[in-house]
Amino acid sequence: CSLMVPCPWRLHAVSLLQETPELSFGVHLTSVSEQPLYRWGPVTCADKVPSLVDEQGYFYSEERIDESLAKLELSELEREYRAQIDWVFATGLRPTHLD
């Protein structure tokens, strides 16, 4: 079981995980918005991770992954991934792994 923090239904997922504490889960570190019509952006403010987002403030789609990789700043990717992990810990949940 994995939790994708940038996705819109994360609060519902957290609620379900809190109701089933015996369930092991991981944080699925996310930096791509896979669906062209159902998009998500960073947990970090977009202006703090400009290399990760497109002109609309969303993560790049899979179709634009080459463009994303060409401008990627590893420090921004680390900032975003840490924010996703910290967000989960702030809910009181304790993930067992990252994926």
Residue ranges and their predicted role:
Residues 2, 22-28, 95-99:
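Structural preference for beta-strand elements that scaffold enzyme active sites
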Residues 4-8, 28-34:
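Active-site beta-loop-alpha junctions enriched in small/polar residues
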Residues 8-11, 75:
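Generic alpha-helical secondary structure signal
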Residues 10-24, 42-54, 90:
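Acidic (Asp/Glu)-rich catalytic clusters
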Residues 38-68:
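Active-site gating loops and adjacent loop-to-helix segments of metal-dependent hydrolytic enzymes
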Residues 66-78:
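Active-site mouth loops of central-metabolism enzymes
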Residues 75-97:
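CE4/NodB-like, metal-dependent polysaccharide N-deacetylase domain
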